[in-house]
């Protein structure tokens, strides 16, 4: 779980458009992980 969060600073190195897509994808990924964890716990 934490290794996803550690990747966030890397987004600054990518161009803004890629940045936005990556941030959106990460947001959904983190959301689904959180929901899954909540569901199984």
From Swiss-Prot:
Record's subcellular location: Plastid, Chloroplast
First-listed, main subcellular location of the protein, grouped into a coarse class: plastid
Any one annotated GO CC term: chloroplast
Keywords tagged on the record: Chloroplast, Plastid
Keyword Plastid: yes
Record-given protein name: Putative uncharacterized protein ycf15
UniProt gene name: ycf15
Family the UniProt entry places it in: Belongs to the ycf15 family.
């Amino acid at each position: 779980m934490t290794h996803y969060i550690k990747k966030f600073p890397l987004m600054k190195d990518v161009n803004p458009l890629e940045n936005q897509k990556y941030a959106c994808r990460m947001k959904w990924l983190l959301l689904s992980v959180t929901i899954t964890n909540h569901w199984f716990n």
